[in-house]
Every structure is written in C-alpha cells, then in structure tokens.
Amino acid sequence: IGDIAGALERDGHPPLYYYLLHAWMEVFGDGDRAVRALSGLITLGTLPLAFLVGRRIAGRRLGLTLALVFALSPYAFRYGSETRMYALLMAEVFAGYLLLDAAITAPRWKTLVGISTVSGLLLWTHYWSMWLLGAIGVLALVRLARAQRRGDRVLVVGTAKIVAALAVGGLTFVPWLPTLLYQSQHTGTPWA
C-alpha cells in the first residue's frame, strides 16, 4: 500500500481508487476479470442511486428513466469495465446529489456528515471533482448571502451548515496537497 502513494507522484490522480483496488485484489486476485469487476460492481451499485436521484427530482417515472439511461449509457458501460476511478466518481456524484438535496430541505447532522464524507471521497478520487465542489460551494455562498439579506435566519443557519460540511470534506484532502503540487509540477495532465 505504501508504494501506491509513491507511484502516484508520477501519475496524475489521487489515491482512493487505487487503495480500494489494492484491497479488492487482496481478496479476489489480480486477473483481468477480477480487477475490472470492482468498477463493474460500483457501476451496478450506482443504478439505484440514479433511480433515487431521478425520483427525488420528479417522481418514480423519472427515477426509472434515469436508471435506464444510466444502464444503457455507453459511458457508464465503458467506465464500468475500466480499471480506473471513473465508476467510483459517478457513484460519489449521485450520492452527493442525494445528500446535498436532502440537506437543502433539512440539514440534519447525519446528512451533513454524509456531505463531508462524500466531498472528501470525491477529492480523493479525482482532481476534477474540485471544480464540482467549488461550484457547489460558490452556489451555497450565494444562497447564504441572499438569505442574510432577506433576514431568513433558518436558511442562513442551514446553508452555513452545508458550507461547513463541504469545508470539512475539503480539509480531509489537505494531507495529499504536497503530492498534488508535486504532480502538477512534474506530470501535469498525463492525458493531455
């Protein structure tokens, strides 16, 4: 496991997926099918999340439609068969949406812990999640400022809790920042 962090200094990704893959390989072996199965199972686990997101937005029919679209998506199929972090990233985004939507309605402690956890997981899974979390953070701060101007104390407190939950998730990533900086100076974006 210690070799993963060192190897990633010469790559362009954070380590979470590779740690999960290492644990997976300890149990199921390192054959091609065994290794790809991790992403496949994560993708299958994302189907109910897609259903829940659609249902939350507009009811059961959209939930079924979104799950079907996800199941038939060539992107989901491709990334569900790759030994890369993209399937995990999709699952985290769907889970994060559900948690954020629930927290906007009623910022309960468990939901806020979930937001912190998923925010941290996103950062530890793929660097581009910083853009997503940054956009969510900006929107939350705009919502907070508007609520303060209107004097809506309940919305101010709820939104401040969401911003704090996002920040706590971001703090979990601080130990990896030196590696991120090293990667940015020595590898850039390896796919470019």
Where are these regions (language model features)?
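Terminal, non-globular segments
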Residues: 1-192
